[in-house]
Amino acid sequence: MSVEHATPVQQPAHAAASVRPVMILAGGTGGHIFPGLAVAKVLRARGVPVTWLGADGAMETRLVPQHAIQIDTLAISGLRGKGIVKLLGAPVRVMRAVRAAGFVLRKRQPRAVISFGGFAAGPGGLAARLLGVPLLVHEQNRAPGMTNKVLSRFARRVLTGFPGSFAGEEAVGNPVREEIAALPAPATRLVGRGGPVRLLVLGGSQGARALNNAVPAALAALGHPAVDVRHQCGEKLRAEAEAAYAQAAVNASVEPFIADMAAAYAWADLVVCRAGASTLAEVCAAGVGSVLVPFAAAVDDHQTRNAEYLVSAEAAVLLKQDDTLAVRLQQVLQTLLADPARRLAMAQAARTLAKPDAAERIADIILQEAGNGKSGMGNGQSAEQLQEHTVIHQNKRTDQALDAASASLHPIPDSRFPIRTSAGGAQ
């Protein structure tokens, strides 16, 4: 499909035609999409309709319609590793994508737009700015992505999951599921708990080969301590994980997916996991100590930056992914498995970092900005007046602004916009 046109994936499902929606820009990975869905749930519970802008064929086109949310898409994709010809042609494609996004905004008439990151967020955010629609940014990671870096320059409010991402930020946290935030305090769960230590290993939806290999090896080297292991490994790496535990003669419950994560966190005494923003938000909300192994190939090493925040609060231990991981994990587990007081202290420290009301706070701020001054979309005009106004507006302002806007979004080898991550790869 040509990038000049936006594709409606699902028809509007607004509660009331007279109520203008909030538009969410998010896609590419679950780390962008799921926080957006959490905020959408809060907004819709308040009677505010939600619309979504994503990228053709990306994950959001499958997930968002499952929640009965209308989604439009742009033909925008990643250029990392695509060669110099693709990079040289990027400014034209970005300008076309911004125009296509402007078409969607004029059609949907959102009262406010919020970017959670992803391929379509850059064009969508720039179009919102050019059309005078209140724009907000929510950055999940401590090391912000290129798209949100650009949009933060002219967003009305810049919200973050962790402190230390932007000057002038508002660290509201990353949304987590209500049932996780509602778990009892660590002292209530952990004090006096008997039996083997309960170790929860989380590899994410794609699995983590480094954890599949290191955890069984570390436990075997410890001489098979009294520990119950529950290892979530992803469907594609299930056989590999089961074989690793069998070879190490370590008993473990290996699961491709855990449906009830709240119950899993409540069960756990200690977690070994990656350091994605959503996972760490859940670990903190649940109140459980963790051993963090950041994904070594993460863009801008953002998982290490995330992990360092928990380490600075003594809520986690950070281990680098390299050839010595199994040995260093053995050393860390040898200490933590034998020290329930330290595990409790880590869990309590994690809980102090939690922001369980993040989705509510983000929704509050969106609606504050939606009602803070006049937006360029609407202001009581009829549809015909609005169309005439926006066409004139675009002709006079948009074309001149697009060159500068696309230049700031032009992807270079170190950029994150727009970047297509490899699909289905084990991390």
From Swiss-Prot:
Primary role: Cell wall formation. Catalyzes the transfer of a GlcNAc subunit on undecaprenyl-pyrophosphoryl-MurNAc-pentapeptide (lipid intermediate I) to form undecaprenyl-pyrophosphoryl-MurNAc-(pentapeptide)GlcNAc (lipid intermediate II).
EC number from the UniProt entry: 2.4.1.227
GO terms of molecular function: UDP-N-acetyl-D-glucosamine:N-acetylmuramoyl-L-alanyl-D-glutamyl-meso-2,6-diaminopimelyl-D-alanyl-D-alanine-diphosphoundecaprenol 4-beta-N-acetylglucosaminlytransferase activity; undecaprenyldiphospho-muramoylpentapeptide beta-N-acetylglucosaminyltransferase activity
Pfam family, one: Glyco_transf_28
Organism, scientific name: Xanthomonas campestris pv. campestris (strain ATCC 33913 / DSM 3586 / NCPPB 528 / LMG 568 / P 25)
Catalytic reaction annotation: di-trans,octa-cis-undecaprenyl diphospho-N-acetyl-alpha-D-muramoyl-L-alanyl-D-glutamyl-meso-2,6-diaminopimeloyl-D-alanyl-D-alanine + UDP-N-acetyl-alpha-D-glucosamine = di-trans,octa-cis-undecaprenyl diphospho-[N-acetyl-alpha-D-glucosaminyl-(1->4)]-N-acetyl-alpha-D-muramoyl-L-alanyl-D-glutamyl-meso-2,6-diaminopimeloyl-D-alanyl-D-alanine + UDP + H(+)
One term under GO cellular component: plasma membrane
Underlying gene: murG
UniProt keyword terms in alphabetical order: Cell cycle, Cell division, Cell inner membrane, Cell membrane, Cell shape, Cell wall biogenesis/degradation, Glycosyltransferase, Membrane, Peptidoglycan synthesis, Transferase
GO biological process, one term: carbohydrate metabolic process
Root EC class: transferase
Protein name stated in the entry: UDP-N-acetylglucosamine--N-acetylmuramyl-(pentapeptide) pyrophosphoryl-undecaprenol N-acetylglucosamine transferase
